From Swiss-Prot:
Name of the molecule in the record: ABC transporter permease protein YxdM
Record function comment: Part of the ABC transporter complex YxdLM which could be involved in peptide resistance.
Keyword line: Cell membrane, Membrane, Transmembrane, Transmembrane helix, Transport
Compartments in which it is found: Cell membrane
Family to which the UniProt record says this protein belongs: Belongs to the ABC-4 integral membrane protein family.
InterPro entries, alphabetized: ABC-4_Integral_Memb_Prot, ABC3_permease_C, ABC_permease_BceB-typ
Reported induction: Transcriptionally regulated by YxdJ. Induced by the antibacterial protein LL-37, probably via YxdJ.
Recorded topology in the membrane: Multi-pass membrane protein
One biological process term in Gene Ontology: transmembrane transport
Domain of life: Bacteria
Name of the gene this protein is made from: yxdM
Length: 622
């Protein structure tokens, strides 16, 4: 038998332990490779959105690679610790430290090459679905398949180097131990975890404080940051201290603890929660971020509609604007150069402000005749002191609400004696700002309160294709934001800011969260099967004094269920409290997408739990 064959036999003989490592590594390679295929796709070479998407995907690639580095480091170290006894015996039988180093390197490279091959093959198979989902979420044209030589080379070389250098690094953990320590293996008796009561209560208090601030409503200013800080700190101490403290309290509750199988799973769970506290903390926070992002994106998509604007492009010129004609010529030139056939309207508006508490929001005032002529909106029957309010699609007020009464200011910023009652709130007309429509007589009387302005509206087809020229015009019009006498907005720009950019963030975030989920489940698998022999011996001893196979299975099931779903439940709680602020404000459209995302993660977690439980019980019963 050659040395390489010996290494291969070791891998196949320890396939139970290596299986989760192999599958998780292959999954990391698959995600990295499919992201790389997306990143280097020929269709993404041009375009403003495509450039932003490439930057986001590049950041995601680095995050996945760094995470893969930490994941492989942890996994290899865990495997080496579980095989300390085997290494000690090999050293006693005459294998040299150099040969042992070569053996470990060969084993890791075998697993690495197999993982890379499986991940790349899986990436090819999965790529069409990935491209379809990515294009759908980002609302781009469908991406065709191609031969990704660059993505293939970067993935293969990057992960080969990753596995090689990490195998060299982890050898240090073995070389630092004596033969006696290696032979003892992992059989050392662990002391029972003793949590700090003070830190346990502190963790619970932080969570209660964060949740309480959300429940009181009206979150503003620095409060969101304080809530986030309290939640993160509270979650960490809840997993590392409070959960252990609660289990120790259950042990003191004799009527519960000494009843049937409870004594077994509670005692075992104390150690396992302590061992996995940091892992649970990371998974719960990342999952909560992914779930919350889904809800926020759903709110954006349902409340900020670029399509609601009457014009594809809007330019507002205030009085005494020296660059008005220059800007209008630039807009005409860009639209004509890029092949857009358009029409242009000019609307006289009055730029006025009204008092709302301590703020003085701006609003564009137009006459009811112009509202009917240019926006095809009927607001007939308005009295002299009445107005119809149209929020802007880019307005901060996503709920389409308005004050019952508008107390208008004059051009000096002083409160005038003119007040308008809001008769009705309708859908937005433009992206730039809110509009109020008044009858023609009232408009003539009140327009002098504000700054005279001209609103130019451009209408054309295929507005989603005008993002690049919109960005170019916006940079030209606003310049360095000094001495600006105009405003500019476009459907494409609004749509990009409120839908496509958040969608890109969610697209990347969800896949990174999936990688973390898979890795977390794999970590649990490693922990369980590393301690399998010790657990089997303990249950055999308990069976001799009356523990039935059914009770053993129930004890294992309870422990695994808590280990798999505990961080998931905490993440869902964080998400529900985070999104409660939206519910308080009246946003009810987050439930569907949020339920779909959480349900998807739950089904994945459930399937992994059932698979691990089945495999673990089979090994325990041998």
């Amino acid at each position: 038998m050659t040395f390489l064959q010996f290494a291969y036999k070791n891998v196949t003989r320890n396939k139970r332990a290596y299986l989760a490592f192999f599958l998780s590594s292959a999954f990391s390679v698959l995600i990295f490779f499919t992201f790389a295929m997306f990143l280097f796709h020929p269709a993404l070479k041009e375009g403003y959105l495509n450039n932003i998407a490439k930057k986001g995907l590049t950041a995601a690639e680095w995050m996945i690679f760094v995470f893969s580095f930490l994941f492989v480091l942890y996994s290899v170290n865990a495997f080496l610790k579980s095989r300390n006894k085997e290494f000690g015996i090999l050293l006693m039988q005459g294998i040299t430290p150099g040969q042992l180093r070569k053996l470990i390197t060969a084993e890791n490279m075998i697993i690495g090459v197999m993982s890379i091959a499986a991940g790349i093959i899986g990436g090819f198979i999965f790529s069409k679905t990935f491209f379809t989902v990515g294009a759908y979420i980002l609302e781009m044209d469908a991406l065709p398949l191609y031969m990704p030589w660059k993505a293939l080379g970067i993935t293969a070389c990057g992960f080969l180097l990753l596995f090689f250098f990490l195998s060299q690094f982890t050898i240090l953990f073995v070389r630092s131990n004596t033969v006696i320590k290696l032979i003892k293996g992992t059989g050392k008796v662990k002391p029972e975890p003793k949590p700090s009561v003070l830190l346990s209560l502190f963790g619970i208090a932080c969570l209660c404080g964060g949740y309480g601030m959300v429940l009181k409503g009206n979150v503003h200013g620095a409060e969101p940051f304080i809530i986030l800080l309290l939640t993160v700190i509270g979650t960490y101490f809840f997993f590392s201290q409070s959960s252990i403290w609660i289990l120790r309290a259950l042990k003191k509750w004799k009527t519960f603890y000494l009843r049937g199988k409870n004594i077994i799973w509670v005692s075992d769970l104390v150690y396992r929660l302590k061992d996995n506290a940091r892992l649970f903390f990371i998974v719960s926070i990342i999952s909560a971020v992914a779930f919350t992002a889904t809800g926020v994106l759903a709110m954006y998509k349902s409340t900020v509609g670029a399509e609601e604007s009457a014009y594809e492009m809007e330019y507002l010129s205030y009085s005494n604007n020296p660059k008005e004609q220059t800007h209008l010529k630039d807009i005409d030139h860009e639209l004509k150069t890029h092949g857009f056939t358009y029409t242009k309207d000019k609307i006289d508006v009055s730029y006025v402000r009204y008092q709302e508490g301590e703020t003085v929001p701006p609003v564009y005032m137009i006459s009811e005749s112009d509202a009917a002529k240019y926006f095809h909106v009927k607001v007939n029957g308005l009295k002299e002191d009445e107005a119809v309010y149209f929020p802007g699609t880019y307005d901060r007020n996503f709920k389409n609400e308005a004050p019952d009464q508008l107390k208008l200011l004059n051009q000096k910023g002083e409160l005038s004696d003119q007040k308008l009652s809001v008769k009705e709130v309708k859908k937005p007309l433009i992206s730039l700002n809110a509009i109020i429509a008044v009858n023609d007589q009232t408009f003539d009387q009140l327009k002098s309160l504000g700054d005279k302005a001209s609103l130019y509206g451009y209408s054309y087809d295929h507005w989603k294709d005008s993002l690049e020229i919109s960005q170019s015009l916006q940079n030209e019009i606003y310049g360095n934001y000094i001495d600006v006498h105009s405003d500019f907005a476009s459907k494409a720009g609004t749509y990009y800011d409120t839908v496509q950019l958040p969608s890109l963030s969610l697209f990347i975030g969800l896949f990174i969260a999936i990688v973390f989920f898979v890795a977390a489940a794999s970590f649990l698998y490693f922990r369980l099967f590393t301690d399998l022999d010790e657990d089997r011996e303990r249950y055999r001893s308990l069976a001799k004094i009356g523990l039935s196979e059914r009770e053993m299975a129930q004890s294992v099931t309870i422990q695994l269920a808590i280990l798999f779903f505990f961080p998931f439940v905490i993440a869902v709680m964080h998400t529900l409290f985070a999104l409660r602020t939206l519910a308080v404000e009246g946003y009810s459209d987050v439930a569907g997408p949020l339920s779909l995302t959480i349900g998807g993660f739950f089904i994945f977690q459930l399937l992994f739990f059932l698979a691990v439980r089945s495999s673990y019980l089979k090994k325990m019963n041998k």
